Amino acid sequence: MEQSAPAVLLQDVKKSFPLGHGHALEVLNIASLALPVGSHTVLKGPSGSGKTTLLNLIAGIALPTSGRIQVNGTDLVPLPEPQRDRLRAAHIGYVFQTFNLLAPFTALENVMLAMRFANTIPRRRQRQRAIEILSQLGLKTRLSHRPAQLSRGEQQRVAMARALANDPPVLLADEPCASLDAATAQVVLMALYNICRERATTVLIVAHDTAALAGAAQVLDMREINRATGQPDGVEGA
């Protein structure tokens, strides 16, 4: 039986930042990384080890200095920025560490706006879809609340609902529970894992807490997969 292609594939990926005077700082150097379809992976490592940089590359927010990145069968690197934006909106959910909710809008509206931008779900279904996913995350009674009226845990769940709204094949989350207490983190993450398991969503979470590690099938340590020295070299890169 032929094995299906991975949901996320990185090959010889490097990322450097220019320092000037012909020098660059290499922050990422990954020979190979493959995430199978439907897998749940936690990425851990110390601060500054390249975790967020890796997520941004997979999301197409940033481009590598060199190498190949494939998400859901599409090579990201050759795509112009507008095409990467459209691909991310439709195929990649991203839960940012800072939530990035729009303050003037309610929880329901924040989730619906993500669907409007991606335009992959018919408008007549968007409201009901947003209500369903917010309810699955325990926010049925918070639909009309704005971010300032929600607790940190509730804001995080709205951010997760927004990331999942378009039913993306791939979900990325950057320290989604860093500001939550242990009990709330466990509730939030288990709800997230359950939804993704139902939809065979490929999940990559940057985390170090027990709840995240307990729900993952695979744990990767950046110190083991990232070969970057973190030292300036003599070649300008970007």
Language model segments and positions:
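ABC-family P-loop ATPase nucleotide-binding domain
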Residues: 1-16, 228-238
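ABC family nucleotide-binding domain
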Residues: 7-8, 13-223
